[in-house]
Amino acid sequence: MSKIQSAENFVKERYLGTIRKDANISHYEHLTAVVTRLKNLGVTDEDTLAAAWLQDIIDYTNTSFDELDQRFGSSVAVLVLSMSKDKSLPKSIQEEQYVKQLKESTLDAKLIKLCDISSSIKNLKNSPLSRTRKIKEMKKKLYYLNVIKPDLIKNKDQIPGIAGFVNGVNEVITSYGLRPVVFQ
């Protein structure tokens, strides 16, 4: 079984029956959309695709870095960790540290995050949350998008699909009265 298939199966097991709090879909459906988007960008690297399946697993389950390292190797585990919040820190510092991690993360991590943001914002549009709550969630996702944007812009010619995802995000957010992300 491939590492990607193992990661997908692991996610199915760990997220069994869980629904995302910001949308009325399962974690598995969201992660399927993230991985599909990544493949649409032309990503074929096994470690990157496995990490995309596992990107939220440290944040939302009792899965540890060591367990990921043991099951999927250090490359996947480090990539997942770069997209995870450090729950041992106080809440106020957690967010600051997370933003720093995103800024310093690899292009692969930033591409996964872009696909995560794209899927999350699309799902928010159809979410049962109030308009005010949707806008609040969108603003948070847009903040993360702006953090990773410089590296995405640098690589938009090599990975042309990046601009399409940003345009898709802009389509949704402007319908909520938010300013579009400038991507040039």
Label every model-predicted segment:
Residues 1-184:
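Active-site helical microenvironments for divalent-metal-assisted chemistry
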